[in-house]
Amino acid sequence: MAEPIPVWPGEFVRLDDGEIFVRTAAPPGATAGPGGDAAPAVFVHGFGGSSTNWTDLMHLLSSAGSGAGPALWCDALDLPGFGQSLPTEASCSVSGQAATVAALIEARGRGPVHLFGNSLGGAVCTRVAATRPELVRTLTLIAPAMPDLLVRPATARFPALCVPKFGGWLLSRVQKMSPQARVEASIATIYYDGSCVHPDRIAGDIAEIERRDQLGYGPAVLVRCARSIVAEYLRRGATSLWRDAARVNSPALIIYGSHDRIVDPRMAGRAARTFRRARVVVLPRTGHVAQMERPAAVAAEFRGLLAGNEPLPVPVV
């Protein structure tokens, strides 16, 4: 097993409602935005994740990855309350998180970006692309958490997090598990084959859980975000996420994992029918976090989107 790529360095970026932490992978001496030599990209993690979820894909898409096609200036943020970013009052709703992403793009001042989102981040990016189209050059969604009322076994406890008091009690029971047990349970859920995770990455995840356990606000953020996601799943009418998807006019790449235990890969069909300019792919032998489990395949599909190539055949799942 090859040595893992170190996490990218980062800095706090001040926005109107507070600071967020942003990690950057860019070629030395490159500039982004109008007149720059590296197209800007922004990456948004999922529920319980952080900017480090994009480490390998950022490596491949920046010049450091030496991949084919133009190099990207890659910025991955920690949503408020996750990673290194502190929570804010309105930060846990999908619309609030979308506003944070839009504010970051504007603060960077680099023009429309290639926008990437995984899981909850995929829902957030869909809303950004629908409501702020001038900020989005292309949209790449990996297992986006779009409304699907068929509850999967891995997410059966999710609605329970929304029940007053019970949600907090449920999370307190999870927190009684050792950090190592929590990391192992997460890997078993989000990967098709967890053996691909390097021991150093596991050690880093354990250390991060230990750090966040000392912060105090983690469980409350998770409960508030869970309630926001469930509310979006139940929303109907012009402001629903699927209506947002139908309004997206930028070229879109939507990637599902054939063995995703959280987002049903059969949602690929609805995504293909709903997004106007969609390249929809189901990656075989892949779980919920394709950018972590199969970053080279994700990078290749993104390059195909830029080149206008046809996607690979979608396998039957």
Task: State what each model feature region is.
Residues 8-11, 15-30, 35, 55-62, ...:
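Active-site loop/oxyanion-hole signature of alpha/beta-hydrolase fold enzymes
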Residues 130, 137-173, 177:
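Flexible "cap/lid" loop of the alpha/beta hydrolase fold
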